[in-house]
Amino acid sequence: MILKRILFLFTSVTLLAGCSSGRAPEIRAICLRDDIGNYIIKWETDPHTDGMMKLYVSDTPNSFDMSRPCSYADINDGRVTYITNDNITRKYFLLSFNDKYYRTVGARSVQMDSVQNLRDIGGYFSEHGNRMTGWGKIFSSGELKALSRNDTIRLDNLKIKTVIDLR
């Protein structure tokens, strides 16, 4: 009888420990721009996570006003759209999953009138997943000549300090 109770207790503790491992879910997120400049943010969690996703927006990737989410979504929806009329200032987004797990994203491609393929190389994790290239720190692009007025403003807003032409 005592052996049965010990076995039951051991089995219960083992099962409960497995269910509440506390392991953070892997969060994969991407930010895209639609044809009119709105931001579409998509995400997946592994393992599957239920609850609420809060979306915060900022002009910089490291400073978000956590008292004012701009949007809410059910985590299971897997997407939210941020509507903007500002196609000059670049936006970054902080996704908060149940106020416990966080992921910062931005649109990788920067919309320009006369520059092809200007991309933010931030947001990539190291091989072991413990370090990430900072958003808004390194960009790649095609030629930067003959910029339109809006492109000049957009580049100024990116606060690029050094341009290296590798051609």
State where each predicted segment sits:
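Positively charged n-region of N-terminal signal peptides that target proteins for export
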Residues: M1-R5
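Sec-dependent N-terminal signal peptides
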Residues: I6-L15
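Cys-dependent protein tyrosine phosphatase-like superfamily
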Residues: C19-R167
